[in-house]
Amino acid sequence: MTYQKANLPKPRKQPYAWVTWLAQLLAGEKNCTYAIQQQIHHQFERKSRDYDASEHDEKVIKRAAKLQAEGFTVYVENANSFKVQGKKFNICVAGRPDIVAVKNDWVVVEDIKTGKPKSSHEMQVKLYMLLLPLAPETQQTCQDKVPHGRIIYSGEIVEIPAWKIDRNFKRRLRDLIAILCTSKTFKPCPSVSECRYCRIPSQHCSQRKI
C-alpha cells in the first residue's frame, strides 16, 4: 500500500491535535467529534481556502509595535510555536498564539481576531494560557506561571485573567482528550456548515453533506 494516492490519509505516529480543534469542541461550535478524531489520528490533505491573511498579519504587526512601545518584550507567531506531550494520554497538542509579551514578571498571551467574536476564541486563548507554561519551547518565556490572556478584536479587547484556568477548565479538557484518544470510533455528525470546510474526504465519510 502506498500513501501517495490523492486523499489517502496517512496514520500519525502519535495522536496530534491543534489547539484550535480542541477549542471548537470545548465551545460547542463543532458537533462532529468524528471529524476531529480522524484528524488527530490521521493526516489528510489540506483543503484550499480563500482566506486572505493580510488583514490579520497587519493587525499583529501593529499590536506588537504598540506593546513594544509600552515596554514589553514581544514574541510573534512562529516564535510562540509549542508542543505539549500528554502525560496521562498519548497525544501531542500544538499551538501558535499570535503574541506573547513580557514585561518584568507580567506575561500576556494575545490572539488577534478579524471576524466576529466566538466562544471558541476564548477557549483558544485559555488553552494557550494553560499550555504555554508547560511546553519546553515557551516555559522559560512564561516564567513557569499561567500568563494573562487577551483576545484582540477590532472594536474591543477581552481580558482573560489567569484565575480562569481553574480546576473545572482543566477537567473539561482532560475529559475531551480522553474521548478523542479512545479506541472507539465516533459516528459522523454531518451538517452543511461543518462539512463545507471539513478535511475528511467523501471516500472516508459517506455521510458528507457537501
Predicted regions and their residues:
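A structural signal for alpha-helix termini and helix-coil/disorder junctions
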Residues: 42-43, 66-70, 134, 179-186
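Short alpha-helical "patches" and their helix-cap loops
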Residues: 44-58, 144-155, 210
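Secondary-structure transition/capping residues
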Residues: 75, 139-140, 184-187, 209
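Short cysteine clusters
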Residues: 32, 189, 195-205
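Residue-level signal for secondary-structure boundary elements
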Residues: 37, 49, 181-188
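Nucleic-acid nuclease catalytic cores
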Residues: 84-184, 193, 199-202
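Metal-dependent nuclease catalytic cores that hydrolyze phosphodiester bonds in DNA/RNA
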Residues: 1-106, 118-119
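Iron-sulfur (Fe-S) cluster-binding segments and ferredoxin-like electron-carrier domains
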Residues: 37-43, 200-210
